[in-house]
């Protein structure tokens, strides 16, 4: 009886959304739209399944009311909207739930698109840096390409990078679980009485009802003083910097006799005084006379600094430090014996902790092992500085870029024992994120190198990175709770640890290495990647196959460490890169989705990194001709069963750039033939100079001439698909051809022919 009453009291989500939607229509003056304009927009969406506009165009040309009007067709197509009303079951907001999906295979499917989106970047950056707001986000839903559920291809997955409050403006340095206030739409707040979190939740709900799964970028570490850390101090390692400074100062006094062997006593005392000052403030100038002594002190103390930092990181010391941290926090908040939540934390807590010399132990370099060794405070004493070492004890501080992050205290590095309470908090934290926003999956950041020599020895963790067993527990937990929940690992395939990430950690898709290896990804090498995946999957006992992303672009492409992104290839080169990933199908055992970034569709250059590092709108390139080509290639690929269900085979690839490949499916009488010049107009290649140093060289593609191909097997060419400026158009041949000749192919030119048996 009680269960029945509970069910009776559960809020009907469709009814609630209809109430909200009515207010949105009233606020946007929906009823004032002209019928002619309504019909125009709806007809486009009926034709394509989405509005085939670039984001800048929809920002500039569509009102909020027009956006809602056109979106109604997407909702109708998904069976959740009829006669002006939403109608769906409470547990079927996600398109995966509505279609009764039982595993993560939907994310792996050939032909499926994943689009990386930053909510802040969706505003009109050509006009203002003001971050995107609610209707900017909703306009993105309208223009997202659809899939083909008859072939199990879901509509484009929205992959959201972190939308939380940021430190230093960076999306990957969260300060709390709360949505950034910069995203708040004051008009929506005033008219709907929705706070910024509710605005994001509504956006995700509308996107899922329009057919788009939504996944979120999550971190296996926290921001330096993120609120989850301050509410649960035991989940991080802590250093008492004042204690470390005192210990180093004492040791400095002890090594005076050793210094007196080489230097005058008076000079040593002056240098020691300056050194102790620098431990606290980091600032100081040395004449050449004292600099030599300073460097000698640094050399002598290096091992000691490592030793005392390691000692302070051990469990017994950490328990004492956590107790001290809790006392400081309790005093700052004027609370006692209270279980804290993020809502209890304020800026005063951070001030009191740092005033007491209490800082979280940071991450480090991608190859760091052990714990970082405290060196001194920064100039003006605003934050601590550390040295980082790898598993061989080599100094890798120059590679360290994670000193602003706080790794979870998952494991005691001194003995390899796991901290189960920390693991439980971590998993519950991400479970709560999923519940709050109804995410369909996670992309888990920073999980490269977690099973190699840099992060574990004989199976025991040795670095700050999340141990693989924790990720395994997280994935199992989420998939047991939500059968269709899919996870994507940021693993770049180094050393081929496929089994470890797939079978042991339960990831569905791996990030791959397409961005750092952009210049190596010729059609033949992409096919070798497909074959690598096939070889792994055919060996599996069950049909839970692994997938690798085909990455046209991601947020790393513009970073200095990689410096590889599509616009470097020129317009034709970028389109051909997109075409390659769409038309080099891997077959049954190598289904691979394609990832791209908001802005790629219009050949936007150098803006992704800016919006990841700063909470601003993206400045977009207004190249609508490029958009038409980009969009048309995607639609064309999804229109062919041979592409989404079949397999590509390289017929020939020559060093001058000439390549031909066949795309076929055994049960079909039709196939496709692609002929291309795979050279890009411009492309960066890495090579070694005469000193053995790695350098980047820009190369220019060349035209190729007088090529021919004999149609393979019993196929004959019957038509060519030619881009007409807006779409690809089929042009039938007068006669069926068995041979094709090409007088000239310019760099990145490609031709698509239909073959029949």
Describe each region flagged by the PLM.
Residues 2-213, 221, 227-232, 237-424, ...:
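N-terminal structural segment of carbohydrate-active enzymes
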Residues 115-117, 158-160, 214-216, 442, ...:
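Hydrophobic faces of well-ordered beta-strands that scaffold small-molecule active sites
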Residues 651-712:
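Carbohydrate-binding surface patches
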Residues 205, 216, 221-250, 315, ...:
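Aromatic- and carboxylate-enriched substrate-binding clefts and catalytic-loop regions
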Residues 587, 610-652:
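Aromatic- and carboxylate-lined catalytic core of secreted/periplasmic carbohydrate-active enzymes
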Residues 319-359, 363, 482-617, 677-680, ...:
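Conserved alpha/beta catalytic core and glycan-binding cleft of carbohydrate-active enzymes
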Residues 732-757:
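C-terminal beta-strand-rich structural cap/linker in extracellular carbohydrate-active enzymes
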Residues 294-296, 301-302, 310, 403-496:
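Active-site neighborhood of glycoside hydrolase catalytic domains
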